[in-house]
Amino acid sequence: MEFAVSGLLARSQLASGQPADARRTIEVLRECFAERGLTRFLPNMDAMLCRIDMHTGDLDAADAWYREKAPREPTHLNVMRRYQYLTQAMVELADGRPDAALLTLAPLEPYIQNCARIIDGIHLNVLTAIALHRKRDEGWRERLTAALDAAAEYRFIRTVSVYGTAVLPLLETLDWDGNKAWRKRLMAAVRTQAAFYPHFLEPRLAPGEELTPTELQILHLLCADKSNAEIAQIMDVKLPTVKTHVSHILDKLDVKRRAEARTAAKKLRLIPDDL
């Protein structure tokens, strides 16, 4: 009960543009629970702190949670960790990996449908819609429509508006024929969240800066300390072509030297940590 009340308070504080207060609410509760040995609640508290980090733009902290505490077990679903799975998908979206987010979300779908988890289903559909939209897959319209239909039926606003700037362009594009009064309230709430947190779930690489498949292959070889000549031989392309690709890669990663590219690529999860 104590966790539920504090969680509601923190979400209300976050929605009101008070992320520092929301963080303090969860951190104080976490410390109290840890002292009392109530460790089973701590993973969800850590996931909630991760969401606050993403709202405030601290993606390094969010990445630390992802590396150290995210479930990352797509073949072994634990429904008690669904809040953490949803958080994991959010980090993956912020990292510019919509495919990874979809892989994380997919196992939740049968459970959510079979057990009629309405709120979880809305979150699942909104996050799936955002991921599909970023993949330029028109299937996002169906998923967002399903989320809006369910949210409107129960008069939920915050369940959708929490995604703020990440869902705003989708809502502006979607031709949804549901309750107009409710939609007006929703759009106002979404715009408020977008104003409070303008970079929430925004990919680190803008669409025009995303690496092409060829550039990703060359990046892997570059980070494996292959020379331009070796890359040209492996890729079966001319040396000037490799040099052009390397130049584009460095520009997109906003670095000057090849050595810096590896660090930037790991931070963006474009290459494995052990490469």
Give the residues covered by each predicted segment.
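Alpha-solenoid helical repeat architecture
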Residues: M1-L9, G17, F33-M48, R72-T87, ...
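TPR-repeat structural position
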Residues: P19, T39, L59, P98, ...
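Inward-facing hydrophobic residues that define packing positions of alpha-helical scaffold repeats
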Residues: I26, W65-R67, T104-A106, I112, ...
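Helix-turn-helix DNA-binding segment
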Residues: P198-S247, D251-K252, E260-L275
